[in-house]
């Protein structure tokens, strides 16, 4: 599929899509469409920030995510920056103010588990298996930080293991 096809699909599909993120098969490849959700109110961030101040735990001070178009723009900017640095991120295929379409990092027809899923599955194999996966996550974060970058939501559930194990 060419860029025009991806853009057309995005423009036709995002207004109809109910979930914020959905998977589709296009011309034999798996893609993800992420659309803007409602803007988030600031009161939760202010409450957590106040609690962090009272407890003198600056690590709990939240980084506001305003949601909506702002969140889409931020995510697009981060994906493009990380990709330009050679870090493995999904390729953005098409984008507009309200949504974007990205290529799946996996192989069509095969599952691409998150690091969180793999850690959960490894629990039965014991702590050595879990620790190896946990260290893989730390190595990934170290690689990102080595480029003077950061991930805003570096949870194991958001880190994807590609078919080549990376």
Task: Describe the residue ranges of each PLM region.
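AlphaC helix of the protein kinase catalytic domain
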Residues: 111-125
């Amino acid at each position: 599929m060419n860029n025009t096809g991806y853009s057309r699909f995005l423009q036709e599909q995002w207004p109809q899509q109910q979930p914020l993120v959905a998977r589709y098969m296009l011309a034999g490849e798996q893609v993800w469409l992420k659309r803007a959700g409602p803007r988030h109110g600031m009161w939760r961030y202010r409450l957590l920030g106040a609690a962090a101040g009272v407890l003198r735990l600056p690590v709990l001070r939240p980084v506001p995510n305003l949601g909506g178009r702002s969140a889409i723009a931020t995510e697009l900017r981060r994906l493009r920056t990380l990709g330009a640095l050679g870090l493995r991120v999904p390729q953005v295929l098409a984008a507009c103010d309200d949504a974007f379409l990205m290529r799946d990092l996996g192989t069509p027809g095969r599952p691409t588990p998150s690091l969180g899923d793999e850690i959960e599955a490894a629990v039965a194999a014991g702590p050595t298996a879990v620790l190896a996966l946990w260290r893989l996550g730390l190595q990934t974060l170290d690689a990102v930080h080595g480029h003077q970058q950061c991930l805003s939501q570096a949870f194991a559930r958001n880190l994807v293991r590609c078919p080549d194990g990376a």
